[in-house]
């Protein structure tokens, strides 16, 4: 039996099985809004509509795609989530370009859900430790005098906020933001801001006095980080950063345990 004959034989023998499998697995039909979304996305990516240019009106899109208003609106909402259009009340959708913030925004819901699972906070804290460890080493090796001055200014605001918990949290976030800005990578910034937002939102409510003590410890650890960066010592900067974040993690874990016992 030749090769082609053998192939033909296998095809004939297996066709009833394939037919049964296909009948048991119906093809998924796309919604009209999904088809409109895909077509508009391709048009935007082909530069048929330039950045900042308005798309046709809803009525024109309805006529062009021969669909109803709900399908057009769903498609535009999906494109907005992707960062491909901006939608303002009373105006036609305008083409935009997705940013790092758009990417992080898409992940935000999943991240918050993950944080609510057992061990979720610990996993995100480990991610933050790995991420900021790289940032602080880079800062110690490459930070300019101007960037170190910005860190010092953030540290000064830190010190002025020790007795005001809300202000200290803002200055704490700002200190780490200045650190994340040093490489000049907008994706790093978006990841860093999102990580802190997610972690802070997951933290328990704590009495003011306990937070005052925590603020003072964090401030002293920030000083150690800046001193190491100023000396351009990446190993010492990394040790100071890891000591700081491990301390923060342990403190908030203890706060959480105390809060749970009171419930």
Swiss-Prot record:
PROSITE patterns: HTH_GNTR (PS50949)
UniProt superkingdom: Bacteria
Pfam families membership: FCD (PF07729), GntR (PF00392)
DNA-binding region: 58-77
GO BP term, example: negative regulation of DNA-templated transcription
Region described as Disordered: spans on this chain: 1-21
SUPFAM superfamilies per the UniProt record, alphabetical: GntR ligand-binding domain-like (SSF48008), Winged helix' DNA-binding domain (SSF46785)
Disulfide bond positions: none
CDD domains recorded: WHTH_GntR
GO molecular function, one term: DNA-binding transcription factor activity
Domain HTH gntR-type, chain residue ranges per copy: 30-98
Keywords assigned: DNA-binding, Repressor, Transcription, Transcription regulation
Function: Transcriptional repressor that controls expression of the genes required for the catabolism of sialic acids.
UniProt similarity note: Belongs to the NanR family.
NCBIfam families per the UniProt record, alphabetical: PRK03837.1
Name this protein carries in UniProt: HTH-type transcriptional repressor NanR
Lineage: Bacteria, Pseudomonadati, Pseudomonadota, Gammaproteobacteria, Enterobacterales
């Amino acid at each position: 039996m030749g090769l082609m004959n053998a192939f033909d034989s296998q095809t004939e023998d297996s066709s009833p099985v394939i037919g049964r499998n296909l009948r048991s697995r119906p093809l998924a039909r796309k919604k009209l809004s999904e088809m409109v979304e895909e077509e508009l996305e391709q048009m935007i990516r082909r530069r048929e509509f330039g950045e900042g240019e308005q798309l046709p009106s809803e009525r024109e899109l309805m006529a062009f795609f021969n669909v109803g208003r709900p399908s057009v609106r769903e498609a535009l909402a999906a494109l907005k989530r992707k960062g491909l259009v901006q939608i303002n009340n009373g105006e036609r959708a305008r083409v935009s370009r997705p940013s790092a913030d758009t990417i992080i925004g898409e992940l935000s819901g999943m991240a918050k859900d993950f944080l609510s699972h057992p061990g979720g906070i610990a996993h995100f804290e480990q991610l933050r430790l790995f991420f900021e460890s790289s940032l602080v080493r880079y800062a110690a090796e490459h930070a300019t005098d101007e960037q170190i001055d910005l860190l010092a200014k953030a540290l000064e605001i830190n010190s002025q906020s020790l007795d005001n918990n809300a202000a200290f949290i803002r200055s704490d976030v700002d200190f780490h933001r200045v650190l994340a800005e040093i490489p000049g990578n907008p994706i790093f910034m978006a990841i860093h801001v999102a990580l802190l937002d997610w972690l802070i939102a997951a933290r328990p409510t704590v009495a003011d006095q306990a937070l005052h003590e925590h603020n003072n410890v964090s401030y002293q650890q920030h000083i150690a980080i800046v001193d190491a960066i100023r000396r351009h010592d990446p190993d010492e900067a990394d040790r100071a950063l890891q000591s700081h974040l491990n301390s923060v993690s342990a403190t908030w874990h203890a706060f959480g345990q105390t809060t749970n016992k009171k419930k």
